[in-house]
């Protein structure tokens, strides 16, 4: 027996073509007939619903929805009043026969499901005309299909990609960072909050070494823009500047790190040649630092275990601050070898003291810098 659909006589012509079905307004006589049937049996069978639908002039699927909504309202009211729900009364009535869907009908429904998992009333009515099935059964078919296959069909949510899922060179470009690394003692750096999964996905300003597969990169709240590398360093605190990453193809050649410029000078008065001092540095990692000409990283001068680094201009330093020429003053002598504290570090951290054993290279570059300044 073919069931009437809402498109036969109940819905006006202007309601068809919209995304959702138009709300059905019940007349007082229809509401009384429905409530009287509900008092007799809250769970009417298919035969009772069809007779009631024919009597009040409403399609049977709308009558079924009304009974479902009324049962939900009554159940909520009984729960608020702490009364037990009576449930079914009387003998159970027959249920609707299972709708048989042929292979061709299933193929049409599957193609429509692949295009749109949530078809509107107009699309469902069009499918009802093509398949010969009632629109209400098509709606139930789509509901069941969405429940069984939540990830299939159209309008699927896009997968959110992250830094680790993005291929090198793809996605949004990462901002250029100049990272700071917190050091408790010279040569010891704290681990970064997060580490990119691939060296190709590292943002500019992170530090790549030949010995390290992934280098730590700080969060944006702890980083400064690349243009701000010549900004003054903090007056106090145990922070070390980190040199920017070299361009592609130049990772195998170590470059000289930059000490922070003088705090009292402006950006225009600073000489970029005076700010940079020679000497390789290592990537800051937990534990003893491994210095060597392997790449750029956080500048972490070595010291003994008992003498921490208190900041710029205080305590022992590796290369010292940049020389500032004065009127009538002769250039200072060549830097002296490290003191006893650095010698004690050689025994505990042999890797960190290796960059200091290059007097020829250091004196040559320092002499050239002093000659240019004079």
Curated annotation (Swiss-Prot):
- Its main subcellular localisation, reduced to a broad class, is nucleus
Q: Which GO terms describe its cellular component?
A: cytoplasm; nucleus
List where Polar residues composition bias occurs.
Answer: 1-10, 354-374
Q: Where is the composition biased (Low complexity)?
A: 278-302, 319-329
InterPro entries in the cross-refs: HD, Homeobox_regulator, Homeodomain-like_sf, HTH_motif
Tissues where this protein is expressed: Expressed in muscles, as well as in primary myoblasts and myotubes (at protein level).
Q: Which SUPFAM superfamilies match?
A: Homeodomain-like
Recorded GO terms, molecular function?
DNA-binding transcription factor activity, RNA polymerase II-specific; RNA polymerase II transcription regulatory region sequence-specific DNA binding; transcription cis-regulatory region binding
Ranges annotated as DNA-binding:
19-78, 94-153
One Pfam family, please name it.
Answer: Homeodomain
Q: Where is this region: Disordered?
A: 1-24, 72-102, 218-374
Basic and acidic residues bias located where?
A: 265-274
| A biological-process GO annotation | regulation of transcription by RNA polymerase II
Q: Where, per UniProt, does this protein localize?
A: Nucleus; Cytoplasm
Which superkingdom does the taxonomy of this entry point to?
Eukaryota
Which keywords label this protein? Answer: Cytoplasm, DNA-binding, Homeobox, Nucleus, Repeat, Transcription, Transcription regulation
Q: What does this protein do?
A: Down-regulates MYOD1 expression and may up-regulate MYF5 expression. May regulate microRNA (miRNA) transcription, up-regulating the expression of some myogenic miRNAs, including MIR1-1, MIR133A2, MIR133B and MIR206. Impairs the differentiation of myoblasts and may be involved in muscle regeneration. Reduces DUX4-induced nuclear localization of CTNNB1/beta-catenin and its subsequent activation of target genes.
The illness linked here is: Up-regulated in myoblasts of facioscapulohumeral muscular dystrophy (FSHD) patients (at protein level). Overexpression in primary myoblasts results in disorganized myotubes, troponin T delocalization, and abnormal beta-catenin accumulation following differentiation, suggesting that DUX4L9 up-regulation may contribute to DUX4 toxicity in FSHD.
Q: How does it assemble?
A: May interact with MYF5; regulates MYF5 expression.
Q: From the Swiss-Prot or TrEMBL record, give the protein name.
A: Double homeobox protein 4C
* Protein's organism: Homo sapiens (Human)
Question: What is the organism lineage in this UniProt record?
Answer: Eukaryota, Metazoa, Chordata, Craniata, Vertebrata
């Amino acid at each position: 027996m073919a069931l009437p659909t809402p498109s036969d006589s109940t819905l006006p012509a202007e309601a068809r073509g919209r995304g959702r079905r138009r709300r059905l307004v019940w007349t007082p006589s229809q509401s009384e007939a429905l409530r009287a049937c509900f008092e007799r049996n809250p769970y009417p069978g298919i035969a009772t619903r069809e007779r009631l639908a024919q009597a009040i002039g409403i399609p049977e699927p709308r009558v079924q929805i009304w009974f479902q909504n009324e049962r939900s309202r009554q159940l909520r009211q009984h729960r608020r009043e702490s009364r037990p729900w009576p449930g079914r009364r009387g003998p159970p009535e027959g249920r609707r026969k299972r709708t048989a869907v042929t292979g061709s009908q299933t193929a049409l429904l599957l193609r429509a499901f692949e295009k749109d998992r949530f078809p509107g009333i107009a699309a469902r009515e069009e499918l009802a005309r093509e398949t010969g099935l009632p629109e209400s059964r098509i709606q139930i078919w789509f509901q069941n299909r969405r429940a069984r296959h939540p990830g299939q069909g159209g309008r699927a949510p896009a997968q959110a990609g992250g830094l680790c899922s993005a291929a090198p060179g793809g996605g949004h470009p990462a901002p250029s960072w100049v990272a700071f690394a917190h050091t408790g003692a010279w040569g010891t750096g704290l681990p970064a909050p997060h580490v990119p999964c691939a060296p190709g996905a590292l943002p500019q300003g992170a530090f790549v070494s030949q010995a390290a597969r992934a280098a730590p990169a700080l969060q944006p709240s702890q980083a400064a823009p690349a243009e701000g590398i010549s900004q003054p360093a903090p007056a106090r605190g145990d922070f070390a500047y980190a040199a920017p990453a070299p361009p592609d193809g130049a990772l195998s050649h170590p470059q000289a790190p930059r000490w922070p410029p003088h705090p009292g000078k402006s950006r225009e008065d600073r000489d970029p040649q005076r700010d940079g001092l020679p000497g390789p540095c290592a990537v800051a990692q937990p534990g003893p630092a491994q210095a060597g000409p392997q790449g750029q990283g956080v500048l972490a001068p070595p010291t003994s275990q008992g003498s921490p680094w208190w900041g710029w201009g205080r305590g022992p330093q590796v290369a010292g601050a940049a020389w500032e020429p004065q009127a009538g003053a002769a250039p200072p002598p060549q830097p002296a070898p490290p003191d006893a504290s650095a010698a004690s570090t050689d025994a505990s951290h042999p890797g960190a003291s290796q960059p200091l054993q290059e007097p020829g290279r250091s004196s040559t570059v320092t002499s050239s810098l002093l000659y240019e300044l004079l």
